[in-house]
Regions:
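Divalent metal-binding pocket/active-site signature
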Residues: 134-137, 146-236
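N-terminal hydrophobic targeting/anchoring segments and the immediately downstream early-domain regions
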Residues: 1-176, 233-295, 299-350
Length: 350
């Protein structure tokens, strides 16, 4: 099924890495080898998305290292120095602003921009997100500049440590309790984000950091692109206890489409139907409520189920949600309204 009820349901997708890919210059007109671009967004009914800027570490491993105990672990990437990260992130953000200048997207700076995009008229809306805050100086002097430019979402860490906290490494099987949490600079960062109106994303933060953010009560807790740890025991997924806290704060989990975080064995190869995405969504909904479930594909950052392939077939995911019992109204909430509510809570609290 390519649509729900014979029409495209508007979708807000909570995470993609398109701006960081080598073929980023094809985002406007189409990227044959990419998972997300403007034509694919339109075909899939994606009227809004969070676009991440991210600085890759030099020499990152592509494959996990098996430990003597059988656990799979990716070597934790080294921290990127602030000057290099700031330059890299600024270049990637500039690509988004160029798309805005040329009329291909509208960069969201207020909740009204999200609302205006849902009708399907005009350009889709893009939320600028910094994934891993090495691009921000520990004194936070540059954060106001980033906010003025359009930054509205930030993850304090990627899956490595930095001045703000400790990322959760990619380990399977493992809990997300992999070390210490936020530093004093990280606590100050979260507080300043809340003051400005920048959503704080927890998807790459370890469990100690998650609870540090929860104690600050800065806003609804958000894991923009994660799965349910009960279904796949990867360290990057969210435990039941974390889910309960996300629900209690009015937050959400954007269900990730990355095959390893969906399969119970963490493998990229083998059977990976779209139904796995729906299974994680169903689990989270049954645990804490449909209002806390959203979508966070990680397009262009991870392998996705082959039957999905790319953003042009996003409506297939909504069809899979219907197959596991989500009603039409619930699908619309998962596809759009839940993200809209949480973004509004963070942005209007400032």
């Amino acid at each position: 099924m390519d649509s729900v009820g014979g029409h495209l349901v508007p979708v807000f997708d909570g995470h993609n890495d398109a701006l960081t890919r080598e073929d980023h210059d094809g985002i406007a007109g189409g990227r044959p080898d990419g998972q997300l671009d403007i034509p694919k967004m339109r075909a899939g009914g994606i009227r809004g998305a969070i676009f991440a800027v991210f600085t890759a570490s030099v020499g990152e491993r592509e494959d996990p290292l098996p430990r003597d105990d059988g656990v799979l672990e990716f070597e934790l990437a080294p921290e990127v120095a602030h000057p290099a990260a700031a330059a890299s992130a600024a270049i990637a953000a500039g690509r988004l602003f160029a798309l805005e200048r040329d009329g291909h997207v509208r960069v969201a700076r207020a909740i009204g921009d999200i609302d205006a995009a849902r009708t399907g008229e005009g350009a889709p809306v893009a939320v600028l997100h910094v994934e891993g805050a090495e691009a921000i100086d520990p004194g936070l002097e540059s954060l106001d500049l980033w906010y003025a430019a359009g930054l509205r979402s930030l993850g304090p860490v990627w899956s490595r440590s930095n001045a703000f906290g400790h990322g959760v490494p990619f380990i399977f099987p493992s809990s997300p309790a992999t070390g210490p949490g936020l530093t004093e600079a990280g606590i100050a960062l979260v507080r300043r984000c809340a003051e400005l109106g920048i959503l704080v994303d927890l998807s790459h933060l370890n469990e100690a950091g998650f609870w540090d953010v929860a104690r600050l009560e800065a806003g609804p807790l958000v894991a923009s692109h994660s799965g349910a740890h009960a279904l796949c025991q990867a360290s990057r997924n969210v435990t039941d206890r974390q889910l309960d806290e996300i629900g209690a704060t009015g937050g959400l989990v954007g269900i990730v489409f990355a095959i390893p975080f969906l399969r119970e064995d963490f493998k990229e190869e083998g059977d990976a139907p779209i139904a796995l995405i729906a299974s994680h969504a169903r689990y989270v909904a049954d645990r804490i409520g449909v209002e806390h479930v959203a979508l966070g594909s990680d397009f262009d950052g991870a392998p996705v189920p082959p039957a999905l392939g790319d953003a042009s077939r996003m409506q297939l995911v909504l069809g899979a949600l219907a197959d596991v019992g989500f009603t039409a109204a619930e699908i619309e909430a998962v596809a759009w309204h839940n993200w809209r509510r949480v973004l509004a809570a963070w942005w209007t609290a400032a």
